[in-house]
From Swiss-Prot:
Residues 45-71 are annotated as: Disordered. Coiled coil: none annotated. InterPro entries: Ribosomal_uL4, Ribosomal_uL4-like, Ribosomal_uL4_dom_sf. SUPFAM superfamilies: Ribosomal protein L4. One of the primary rRNA binding proteins, this protein initially binds near the 5'-end of the 23S rRNA. It is important during the early stages of 50S assembly. It makes multiple contacts with different domains of the 23S rRNA in the assembled 50S subunit and ribosome. Forms part of the polypeptide exit tunnel. GO terms for molecular function: rRNA binding; structural constituent of ribosome. NCBIfam families: rplD_bact. Gene3D superfamilies: 3.40.1370.10. This is Large ribosomal subunit protein uL4. One of its GO terms (biological process) is translation. GO terms for cellular component: ribonucleoprotein complex; ribosome. It comes from Shewanella sp. (strain MR-4). The keyword Ribonucleoprotein applies. It holds the Pfam family Ribosomal_L4.
Length: 201
């Protein structure tokens, strides 16, 4: 199959298995959920009544004070007491094998092509790390909510995009399923397309 280059009167020959496969919603969902789960820190921790600092002594005698009976000061109903169902440190990571991860990326890329949300250009760069220059370039291409994917890290492009709302720059190595589906349009250079094919082959 072929992908038309937006900035040139030509087309790029690409693999059908990477950019023309059926959309597997269940697989994409599983991989995206796992990716988000793996980003979780999971380091929260609260103390139960057994773990909080304090005396185990009965605060006052059982009878004769007129107050409600109390056996300790570390219970959940006391100020400074333990938490009833205390949250503990937890590992939220989910395992996704390479075949599934690659399959999900291929599925997302293919769906982007079908929806005309994947824009391929011969090259894309800015002369200096100027947000104004990048904004003007994107405006000329009628692009706003866009992920720019380059073959290698372009520092000028990265710095220029850093202060733009709903614009992000990634190299092929930093590509992930969540970023691909988070933007309305994905702008990819021809070199990046070749690298993506090699990576997902």
């Amino acid at each position: 199959m072929e992908l038309v280059l937006k900035d040139a009167q030509s087309a790029l020959e690409v693999s059908e298995t990477t950019f023309g496969r059926d959309f597997n919603e269940a697989l994409v969902h599983q991989v995206v959920v796992a990716y988000a789960a793996n980003a979780r820190q999971g380091t929260r921790a609260q103390k139960t009544r057994a773990e909080v600092t304090g005396s185990g002594k009965k605060p006052w005698r059982q009878k004769g004070t007129g107050r409600a009976r109390a056996g300790g000061v570390k219970g959940p109903i006391w100020r400074g007491g333990g938490v009833t169902f205390a949250a503990k440190t937890q590992d939220h990571s989910q395992k996704v094998n390479k075949k599934m991860y690659r399959g999900a990326l291929k599925s997302i890329l293919s769906e982007l092509v079908r929806q005309d949300r994947l824009v391929v250009v011969e090259s894309f760069s800015v002369e200096a790390p100027k947000t104004k220059e990048l904004k003007a370039k994107l405006k000329a291409m009628n692009l706003e909510d866009v992920l720019i994917v380059t073959a290698e890290v372009d520092e000028n492009l990265f710095l220029a995009a850093r202060n733009l709302y709903k614009v992000d720059v990634r190299d092929v190595a930093g590509l992930d399923p969540v970023s691909l589906i988070a933007f309305n349009t994905v702008l990819v250079t021809a070199d990046a397309v070749k690298q993506i094919e090699e990576m997902l082959a």
